[in-house]
Amino acid sequence: MLYVTYRMTKIAINGFGRIGRPAFKIAFEKNDAEVVAINDLTDLATVAHLLQYDSSYGTYARKVEFDQENSFLIVDGKKIKYLSEPEPENLPWHDLGVDVVLECTGFFETKEKMQKHLLAGARKVILSAPPKDDTPVFILGINEHEYDSEKDNIISNGSCTTNCLAPMIKVLDENFGVEKGFMTTTHSYTNDQRLQDLPHRDLRRARAAALNIIPTTTGAAKTVGLVMPHLEGKLDGISLRVPTPVVSIVDFICTLKREVSVEELNDAFRGAAQEQLKDILAVEEGQLVSMDFKGNPHSAIVDLPLTMANGNLVKVVGWYDNEWGYSNRLVEMAELVGNKL
């Protein structure tokens, strides 16, 4: 699904980590979006190094330099203002003409906190995570048509897992009717976990990420109920964090309103991948493993050989690059928001 804007959308990225950096790389290739500023508390030299070299995705094809004296990150000769301001209200968004802030720090997850970007002069804010309050959530391919530029100044792009799960459920629900379901995501570890055993508010996440399968919570299934309200309260799930650096997989089991066959299910996904959810959802017919999906831009890649059906009880499985795929949707959401300014 391609969102083309008819104006140049000026983007600022707040937080230049595992989502901020790929979002920058994706936006840098757009003709209708421009990253004009990056704000992160890390020093500029380190930021430039981490943008150029990535353990998961390899060396960035663009040349990365920096101007320490004038505080610019320079990518293929293009200068991007670099800031290290901890308080969003003090950022120069007005002076830089920022249209959309991508809030990627993981620290500002409520309207009250994100409002500070608007006070600083930004026109819109998109959170790259599920919100901690009633901030509206929009998922491309699901409910983006409900976005109202007149009132939706602060929105959430949901989580990587919700962006994978929701299109899968949409196909099932529109073709067969979903009654209720449970989801398990086998998810690559993230920086919210510990490299070695160390205190954490979640005692399981306190354990060494590279040595354990770590059961933990996820709000992804419940968030689907926010963007598909008729399913609210009917979905839930857990996450299993595993010792892989990137790419995750959702296993969704549900009951449908009628009995179906595996072929009916897979045909529905094939059709959606070619039409309604093109560029959002894809299908895979081969015998692949997680690293085969690294760098895949889709929200969900349904693994058709893993589909199962027993009457109206079904299992469907979808892969997703929890960094690159999600970051594509984040930038596309910024394009959509920018187009409606």
Predicted regions and their residues:
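N-terminal Rossmann-like NAD(P) cofactor-binding subdomain of oxidoreductases
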Residues: 6-206, 308, 332, 340
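Conserved active-site and cofactor/substrate-binding residues in soluble primary-metabolism enzymes
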Residues: 14, 18, 42-45, 96, ...
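Short clusters of hydrophobic/aromatic residues that line enzyme substrate/ligand-binding pockets
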Residues: 73, 138-140, 154, 196, ...
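Short, solvent-exposed beta-strand edge segments and adjacent coil->beta transition regions
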Residues: 151-152, 208-210, 247-251, 313-315
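Catalytic core of tubulin tyrosine ligase-like
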Residues: 175-239, 254
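C-terminal active-site/capping subdomain that shapes the small-molecule cofactor and substrate pocket
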Residues: 237, 249-341
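AMP-binding (ANL) adenylation modules
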Residues: 241-245
